[in-house]
Amino acid sequence: MTIRLMENFRAIFYAPYYAIQTLGFYKSEGVDVALVTSDTPGDAVAHLINGTIDLAWAGPMRVMMAHERDLASSLVSFGEVVSRDPFFLIGNCDSFELSKLAELRFASVAEVPTPWMCLQHDLRETGINPDAIKRVSDRTMADNYAALRKGELDVMQAFEPFVSMAEMDRAGKLLYAASARGPTVYTAFIATRDAIARHREAFAAITRALAKMEQWLYDNSAEELAKAVAPSFGHVPDDILVASLRRYRDADLWARNPAMSKQGFSRLSSSFVSGGLLKRSPAYETCVEESLC
């Protein structure tokens, strides 16, 4: 049987999900995994519930929100991959501090909610009211990067490859790495409990493959990882891809084992509560399937 795995969206920080297939770790565990692309970020949940896919990778936010809407939701996360926040602030400011953000022309990520939710929580913890910050919140990262290059923005929030591009283009520099805050569970597998019951052996094999992949990440160079994922990022120049992956690897972005961090889960849910996305923090045990790890 083939497990249908849906991609959330294409991003360099998802490199382990592409490399695990290229390097044959699924195959070595005797499981066949077919990658399915999604139309928009977040639409995997509907596909999981109606059974058109078996598994997806996404932020635990999707699971947390599902449980807030329905206490009996069958959605769960397992197999942590991205264990820190992969977003950055990029700009041309000297001696930047978060407290200066209110004085600057700033654009946050519009494509998905988690980056801003996490950043606004960082701001609150430093005594800054995020509601007092004027920000552009309705443009893509690509559009914001174009504005940064033209001098129409001072600071933008983005993931790689925009940091490495900005450095190479001399359009800006790294001002703030959200990964530095520490564990924040950003991406894992999600499935329904029914699917886990049906495919327990296959999902256990996928988790074992993931453990091998995560060990490989820190035993090999960014150049080797770039070779493994290059087919998924044909539009990214080789030097930019390597620089992006090295930055993430050096930041300890990826988990070193598949068990989901309770500290990282708590940090993420607290960010959603303070930002108004959730009314209360969900229980770890309700949202995480621990038996597979």
Regions found by a protein language model. Name each.
Residues 18, 64, 120, 164-167, ...:
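Predominant activation on well-ordered alpha-helical scaffold segments within soluble catalytic domains
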Residues 53, 57, 149-150, 248-262, ...:
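Short amphipathic alpha-helical segments at helix boundaries and their inter-helical linkers
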Residues 197-279:
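Secondary-structure end/capping motifs
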Residues 21, 48, 67-68, 148, ...:
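Hydrophobic residues in alpha-helical segments
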Residues 2-128, 135-138, 154-160, 173-174, ...:
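Short, glycine-/small- and polar/acidic-enriched structural segments
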Residues 143-233:
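Pocket-lining segment of extracytoplasmic ligand-binding domains
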Residues 1-34, 255, 265-293:
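N-terminal hydrophobic or amphipathic helices and topogenic motifs
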